[in-house]
């Protein structure tokens, strides 16, 4: 999965086997957290 570095805004490929990686362009530390699947609520449009 690709992630955009918050410092240099370049795309960084993330390996979910690691919890922390660094941006190869600027060295900014990226912490990877698994997020639970959110449920999508359907709403009726009137």
UniProtKB/Swiss-Prot annotation:
SMART domains: RPOLCX. Keywords: Cytoplasm, DNA-directed RNA polymerase, Metal-binding, Nucleotidyltransferase, Transcription, Transferase, Zinc. GO terms for biological process: DNA-templated transcription. One of its GO terms (cellular component) is cytoplasm. Pfam families: Zn_ribbon_RPAB4. It is an enzyme of class 2 (transferase). GO terms for molecular function: DNA binding; DNA-directed RNA polymerase activity; zinc ion binding. HAMAP family: RNApol_arch_Rpo12 (MF_00615). Belongs to the archaeal Rpo12/eukaryotic RPC10 RNA polymerase subunit family. NCBIfam families: PRK00398.1-3. Part of the RNA polymerase complex. DNA-dependent RNA polymerase (RNAP) catalyzes the transcription of DNA into RNA using the four ribonucleoside triphosphates as substrates. This is DNA-directed RNA polymerase subunit Rpo12.
């Amino acid at each position: 999965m690709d992630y955009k570095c918050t410092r240099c805004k370049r795309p960084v490929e993330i390996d979910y086997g690691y919890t922390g990686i660094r941006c190869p362009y600027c060295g900014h530390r990226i912490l990877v957290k698994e997020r639970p699947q959110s449920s999508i609520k359907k709403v009726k449009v009137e």
